[in-house]
Amino acid sequence: LVDVGTENSAGDRCAYTMVSKDDYGEVKRMVGRMDGLLRYEHYVPQNLTNYYEYLDYYALSAQMPETYQAAYDFIQPVIDTVNRMDTDSEKVKYLNDYLCSLLTYDKKSVAGIIRTFAPHSEELKGACGDYAHDFKFLCGAAGIPCFTISTTNHAWNMVYADGQWLHVDVAANDLYRQNYILLAKTVSDRTDEAPEATAFLKELLAPGSTK
């Protein structure tokens, strides 16, 4: 741990953990998968340069940013409906269909949680990453363990539903207008590029689920 502050700049004091250049990509990918579990901190000490290289900087709080409160309020009626359902599978299917009703797939567009879960009259387009992050947001609000698997060219989710980890690809389900990958035990046409990170997150979100 390194303290970059001084006696005259107490407000700029911080500590960070450095990783090797070879490990940096893997560690950053892990932190990215934990988005929603660990909040990205936006304050940057004035005397800390290249802060994005120091991974602890991204894992300072387990609280959801206050900027998402409006999104939470927007989806509350949906969450109330989901909470009355009997099984996790029912809940996941409902949330999948709900998100498909809000977004239209376009790999060149960016929607984001705040835009997706807000009143809008125009067609809202998003890429696979938008679907994956939005779906994780919905699952989190519904109390369903969920994380995002991101590869070099695609992103989808895994959810812990009714005692097992299953794949959900809302973007593909919306694009093909069918339940293409919805609560699937395996996926044959997708490769998890960080299986160790996946195993770690499964145990983090649902202890004992991989044993």
Annotate each PLM feature:
Residues 1-74, 172:
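Linear, non-domain "peripheral" regions
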Residues 4-7, 37, 81-85, 207:
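Surface-exposed polar/charged interaction patches
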Residues 12, 100-102, 106-109, 121-124, ...:
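Repeated polar recognition positions within modular binding domains
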Residues 58-68, 95, 165, 172-211:
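Intrinsically disordered, low-complexity repeat and linker tracts
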Residues 65-120:
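Secondary-structure boundary elements
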Residues 95, 99, 128, 139:
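Conserved hydrophobic/aromatic pocket- or pore-lining residues that grip, position, or stack substrates
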Residues 116-131:
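A short, highly charged nucleic-acid-interacting micro-segment common to nuclease
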Residues 130-192:
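Hydrophobic/aromatic-rich core segments of domains that either
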